[in-house]
Amino acid sequence: MSDKYTGQCLCGSFRYSISTIDLEGAFSCHCIDCRRATGSAFAAVVPFKIDNFNGDVSVLKKLTHKGGSENDIHRYCCQDCYCPIYINVTRSGGMYLYTGTLDNISDITFSENRKFENGHFEYLNISNKKIEI
């Protein structure tokens, strides 16, 4: 675990620091919700506890939708550039930080790829910890 990580949104108007994150718990999610939320083939996230998060979350835009499980998913984004910062999945109670917002990602090890039936692009060769094109 690192003592401190920092990150920001795309436009830089929202900055944060986080005292600890689960460096070995990072994963890539290939579900349709994560693909749509990021506009990409998958979302790269890392679990964290909101108590360790330092930043004025009241300025973030909260976007809520029903996930594949029909439970609420809350995504918190910069209100200026709409860059996604973190997600709260109510079904599991999990809080996940989008790793792309971190200033330094060199210590993060992805533990797995979470893929679902018809939930990933066929051109991606996905194993548990590796993605190849």
Where do the PLM segments sit?
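A short Gly-Trp-Pro
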Residues: 1-8, 13-133
